[in-house]
A protein has these predicted regions:
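ALDH superfamily catalytic-core signature
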Residues: 1-146, 168-169, 173-174, 207
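Conserved C-terminal structural/oligomerization subdomain of aldehyde/semialdehyde dehydrogenase
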Residues: 28, 82, 132-228
Length: 228
């Protein structure tokens, strides 16, 4: 993103540009959340466009009382996803952008497993049949230990890491424990929304949104940003 901005500013006249600068976006789910709404928003935000967007959610912090239920609902939606040629309407998830992303996916899955993460869904690079004509992967949902380095690394892939919590202030500390502050999402009661908005460190926030946990703005029409 910075290289593009520098190139656009280097000519005789400045030229407008839209750049993707990165994000490591969290979503918090409390025990008071509408879990169907949360599951739909998380799936759309984490896996839409293959997770290859700066606003995609990649970190999920869910209250231990509802964690099993929410993760099961996410898994059920992932089971129903059709992967394939994105020009065909029946397919929801297309390929990742290139061979490098394909290789990165396999490496990140290996790193998750080596640290003892529990892969609840996905983890395979798809190469059989028509999948051999592109860079296809399965969407990943993984419960990972809090010390895993990938919690702070932007993967830019359809990978959602989840962690359970007991205390919401503890969850907020985890959510804010990153150098990036682009977007953040929340699912809980209406009474909890002000607490989320006042404490989360992100430029763009969404609360109880089924259409996308941390996504919504459309680049070029609705510029957005956030930093620390």
């Amino acid at each position: 993103g910075r290289a593009i901005m520098a190139a656009m500013a280097a000519g005789t006249y400045p030229r407008p540009c839209i750049t993707e600068m990165g994000g490591k976006n969290p979503c918090l789910v409390t025990e008071n959340a509408d879990l169907d709404r949360a599951a739909s928003g998380l799936v759309r935000s984490a896996y839409g466009m293959g997770g290859q967007k700066c606003s995609a959610v990649s970190r999920l912090y869910v209250h231990e009382r509802v964690a099993d239920d929410l993760l099961a609902r996410i898994g059920k939606q992932l089971d129903a996803i059709r992967i394939g040629d994105p020009t065909k309407r029946e397919n929801w998830l297309g390929p990742v952008v290139n061979a490098r992303a394909h290789q990165s996916y396999a490496r990140y899955v290996g790193e998750l497993r080596s640290w003892g993460a529990k892969l609840l869904h996905g983890g395979r690079v798809l190469t059989d049949g028509d999948f051999g004509r592109g860079f296809y992967v399965e969407p990943v949902l993984a419960e990972a230990p809090g010390e895993h380095p990938l919690w702070k690394h932007e993967m830019f892939l359809p990978i959602l890491m989840a962690q359970r919590y007991r205390d919401r202030d503890e969850a907020m500390r985890h959510a804010n424990d990153t150098d990036m502050g682009l977007t953040a999402g929340f699912y809980g009661s209406a009474a909890e929304v002000p607490w989320f908005q006042e404490n989360v460190e992100a430029g763009v926030t969404y609360a109880n949104r089924a259409q996308g946990a941390t996504t919504g703005a459309w680049p070029g029409y609705q510029p957005f940003g956030g930093w620390k």
